[in-house]
Amino acid sequence: MKRITFFMLAFAAMVSSLVVAQDKPLSPQATVEGKIGPANVKIVYCQPSARNRKMLGGKEPYGQVWRTGANEATTIEFDKPVKVEGKDVPAGKYSLFTIPGENEWTIILNKEPKQWGAYKYNEKDDLLRVKVKPTKTDNFVETFNIALGKDEVQLKWENTAVAFKVKA
């Protein structure tokens, strides 16, 4: 009887330690919400970290469509019509893809918001493509970050910052 009790206690301790020992995800999900003019903006993305790897122009090659984060494709949602870099965007939810480049980035809003990565990305579903210039950050940004400015969306990772204008 003592043996059975001992094994049951040992098993319970082992199972509970597995539950407690869950690591946080490598690329946790983040949500950015705010206003640009009268429009509410919501961006949902996963935040990869460099972890001693060359990411932009390395693991995420220049000249190829990138999901602009990790895991699911990043989504951006506007509750009112806006202009992105001067181009009309109806209210709605879109995938946010980019094509990174050393001297120029392409920002893509795609009409299909439910995508895993960029594996089934189809250019035919693009609502718009605009080109913007990257800048260098003052400090190294370990974890990919998206933020809302007064009239722009800002992407930062490693030593690169990219912003695109949004006006409502």
Residue positions per predicted region:
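Bacterial Sec-dependent N-terminal signal peptides
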Residues: 1-23
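Targeting-peptide/extracellular-domain and disordered-appendage signature
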Residues: 21-90, 95-168
